[in-house]
């Protein structure tokens, strides 16, 4: 019986510890039409928060499950996404995406859907920025 209680206690402690140590990253918008963090490496279950800005928002263009992407944020509204599925997520600012205002989220260091992300139709400027962000994402491993 004591062993069962000890095992249950350890399991509860592990669950609580995992919840407590989940990380949240905050991303702001810069005056240069970029996100303050353009490539975010996070673990499964972690959260990213985008701080409010009157001129910018967040719209996901691709992810590991193209049928289920986070909803587009409103302008000047706090926006938060918890990432439970590993893979590469591409997002942009709706009015400034064609000018290269993009960001990548790499969840669980999983690049399995990178080819799908690279095939998303973008303006030439945005495509160039995406290639730069992909290089950065791979160099941060």
Regions found by a protein language model. Give the residues of each.
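Extracytoplasmic copper-binding redox domains, predominantly the cupredoxin/blue-copper superfamily
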Residues: 20-141
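Sec-dependent signal peptide recognition
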Residues: 2-10
């Amino acid at each position: 019986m004591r062993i069962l209680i000890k095992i249950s206690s350890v399991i509860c402690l592990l669950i609580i510890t995992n919840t407590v140590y989940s990380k949240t990253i905050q991303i702001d918008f810069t005056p240069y039409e970029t996100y303050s963090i353009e490539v975010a490496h996070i673990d499964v279950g972690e959260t990213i928060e985008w701080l409010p800005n009157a001129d910018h928002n967040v719209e996901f263009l691709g992810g590991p499950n193209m049928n289920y992407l986070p909803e587009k944020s409103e302008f000047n509204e706090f926006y938060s996404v918890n990432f439970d599925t590993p893979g590469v997520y591409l997002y942009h600012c709706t009015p400034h995406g064609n000018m290269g205002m993009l960001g990548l989220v790499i969840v669980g260091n999983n690049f399995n859907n990178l080819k799908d992300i690279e095939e998303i139709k973008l303006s030439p400027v945005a495509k160039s920025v995406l290639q730069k962000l992909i290089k950065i994402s791979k160099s941060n491993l």
